[in-house]
Curated annotation (Swiss-Prot):
It comes from Streptococcus agalactiae serotype III (strain NEM316). Keywords: Magnesium, Metal-binding, Transferase. CDD domains: Cis_IPPS. GO terms for biological process: polyprenol biosynthetic process. Gene3D superfamilies: Decaprenyl diphosphate synthase-like. This is Isoprenyl transferase. It is an enzyme of class 2 (transferase).
Length: 250
């Protein structure tokens, strides 16, 4: 059991640590605007916040941390901003992977990665290769990821198996569909997020893990992502500890 001490030294027991946490990292642009800085500086500050949250989650015993780094819809942003965002994984992996590796963190990526710029793709591959034997927290980047597209592709794969008589339609189950999703590379028990956190005060999923989040608990906070640090993660988990997960039962 972990004990989280608030600033007033009130001890809060953390009986339940969510095995899989998903984070929609939102508010980088607004963070920069409040400080009269370019939007790209918010993304850079968000990168530093991610490193702190990852190490904190690892220390708490979280098994998987899936972070929404770039959606399939984000390509519609201004070209200069997209170019900067695409360079962030290169900078993040080069700067922080040695520390992640030291903390036994394994880097993994889901999404349509073949459409990424070569430098981004290569940096991602280097990080995954360097940490592939680590057995601690899985830092799972959703990069050029879209939930509807993921489900559509799973349906296409299953339909093709039926067309080729490799699969009987009566044998299609939820587990079979899940096995065709990108999260099938995660440990079986931890594929679905127990807790999804969204920063910046927005109250929507934005196409993030729609299948996997069917029974997730949600935590929405007005805190902008660059300001979401270790203490904010603890607050989210304290809130999670006050929930009773029913999974559809009474």
């Amino acid at each position: 059991m972990f004990i989280f001490k608030r600033k007033k030294q009130v001890e809060m027991p953390l009986e339940k640590i969510p095995a899989h946490i998903g984070i929609i990292m939102d508010g980088n642009g607004r963070w920069a605007k409040k400080r009269l800085k370019p939007r790209v500086m918010g993304h850079k500050a968000g990168m530093d916040a991610l490193q702190e949250v990852t190490i904190a989650a690892s220390g708490l015993g979280v098994k998987v941390l899936t972070v929404y780094a770039f959606s399939t819809e984000n390509w519609s942003r201004p070209d200069d901003e997209v170019k900067f965002i695409m360079n962030l994984p290169v900078e993040f992996f080069d700067k922080y992977v040695p520390e992640l590796d030291k903390n036994n963190v394994r880097v993994q990526v889901i999404g349509d990665t073949h459409k990424l710029p070569k430098a981004t793709y290569d940096a991602m591959q280097r990080a995954c290769l360097r940490t592939k034997h680590n057995s601690g927290l899985v830092l799972n980047f959703a990069l050029n990821y879209g939930g509807r597209s993921e489900i559509t592709n799973a349906i296409k794969e299953i339909a093709q198996d039926v067309l080729e008589a490799k699969l009987n339609p009566d044998d299609i189950t939820e587990d079979l569909v899940a096995n065709h999703l990108m999260t099938n590379s995660l440990p079986y028990l931890y594929r679905d997020p127990d807790l999804i956190i969204r920063t910046s005060g927005e109250l929507r999923l934005s196409n993030f893990l729609p299948w996997q989040s069917a029974y997730s608990e949600f935590y929405f906070t007005p805190v902008l992502w660059p300001d979401f640090k270790k203490d904010e993660l603890h607050k989210a988990i304290v809130d999670y500890n006050q929930r009773h997960r029913r999974f559809g039962s009474v």
